[in-house]
């Protein structure tokens, strides 16, 4: 028995067809594919002490919600994770005791609603440069901490795409 858990990204493209089916030439050799769910959760979080995104005022809550709504988890699963993940709807994975299949606590991807939420709370382009500004008119750049790994570079690209579509400048702070 050979196990690849988790399967390296470069292996996935070599053994699976679209739809996560084992390639026929491998099946013809007697190789089988058994899939299992790993109870692993990856999440992003906000520094609640940060003057730009932190705090509990209505506009800061709206900002964090809009950022969450602008991130396309399905695209992350399809592109970055090569179809090898499930969207997390809660902190307890589906194969663990305590998971509630009726609870869905993750923000749904909805870019138009995210933009409308930012507009409503004053995060608009006030100086005409194409980027949203803070409600007080100051420039708005979101900083995201990230590592230098190839995997994190892919996530960074998706974050950049998501926030650019939302009209928010982004600056990645690379950890060494």
Cite the ranges covered by each PLM segment:
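Extracytoplasmic/periplasmic ligand-capture domains
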Residues: 1-82, 86, 91, 95-176
């Amino acid at each position: 028995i050979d196990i690849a858990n988790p399967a390296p990204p470069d292996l996935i493209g070599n053994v699976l067809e679209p739809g996560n089916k084992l390639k026929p030439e491998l099946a013809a050799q007697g190789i089988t594919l058994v899939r299992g769910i790993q109870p692993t959760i990856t999440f992003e979080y906000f520094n609640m002490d940060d003057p730009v995104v932190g705090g509990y005022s209505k506009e800061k809550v709206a900002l964090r919600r809009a950022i969450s709504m602008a991130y396309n988890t399905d695209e992350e699963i399809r592109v970055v994770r090569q179809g090898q993940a499930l969207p997390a709807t809660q902190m307890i994975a589906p194969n663990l005791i305590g998971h509630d299949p009726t609870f869905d606590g993750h923000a749904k991807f909805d870019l138009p609603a995210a933009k409308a939420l930012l507009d409503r709370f004053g995060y608009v382009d006030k100086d005409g440069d194409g980027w949203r500004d803070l409600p007080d008119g100051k420039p708005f750049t979101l900083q995201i901490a990230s590592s230098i790994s190839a995997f994190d570079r892919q996530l960074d690209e998706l974050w950049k795409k998501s926030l650019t579509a939302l009209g928010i400048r982004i600056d990645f702070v690379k950890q060494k």
